[in-house]
Amino acid sequence: MNHKEILDQLVPIVIEQTPRGERAYDIYSRLLQDRIVLLGSPIDDHVANLIVAQLLFLESQDPDKDIYLYINSPGGSVTAGLAIYDTMQYIKPDVVTICMGQAASMGAILLAAGAPGKRYALPHSRIMIHQPLGGIQGQATDIIIHAEEIKRIKEMLIDILAKHTGQPKDKIANDIERDYFMSPYEAKDYGLIDKVIEKRE
């Protein structure tokens, strides 16, 4: 049994009473009814497709009502993360972002990409930004091509962070040279979030 199969067996089932009797949901489907989307894993193409599908579904249900994206992710694939990012910017509803645990790498970019004034973190979470990572093998010409692509992606991510934080691009470029960890309060000062929340208001 692989890791995913084990996790699938551990997903709680919620039983609800309806006029037609009992109805069982997995916990994620039940949260989706309340417009809550959970990003709680490394970001790969499969995870990104699930998140994007949920965002598009919730927009079709009600284009004027906020969507709540809870993030606890170490980051992952840049292209997969950018698929989520672009969808967040594309859809009509505001996407409220809430960091719990950690939002690192692409997770931090998605956190910052929430609707202005609606980006939050819980008090013991952590946020980390850094430059994109690349492990390339192959012929010298291919390595050069991939190195140029990594530089292009790095500039794109700097532009995105500058847009959502208000920080100068040269400061961001310097800060992401190495892993740059922040407490929620430091992330607020940096412009990655708008507020640290301890209790639901």
From Swiss-Prot:
Which InterPro entries does this chain map to? ClpP, ClpP/crotonase-like_dom_sf, ClpP/TepA, ClpP_His_AS, ClpP_Ser_AS
**Taxonomic source organism:** Aquifex aeolicus (strain VF5)
Keyword set includes Thylakoid:
no
The protein in question is named ATP-dependent Clp protease proteolytic subunit
What Enzyme Commission number does this protein have? Answer: 3.4.21.92
One Pfam family in the UniProt entry: CLP_protease
Gene Ontology CC, one term: cytoplasm
Question: Catalytic positions?
Answer: S105 (nucleophile), H130
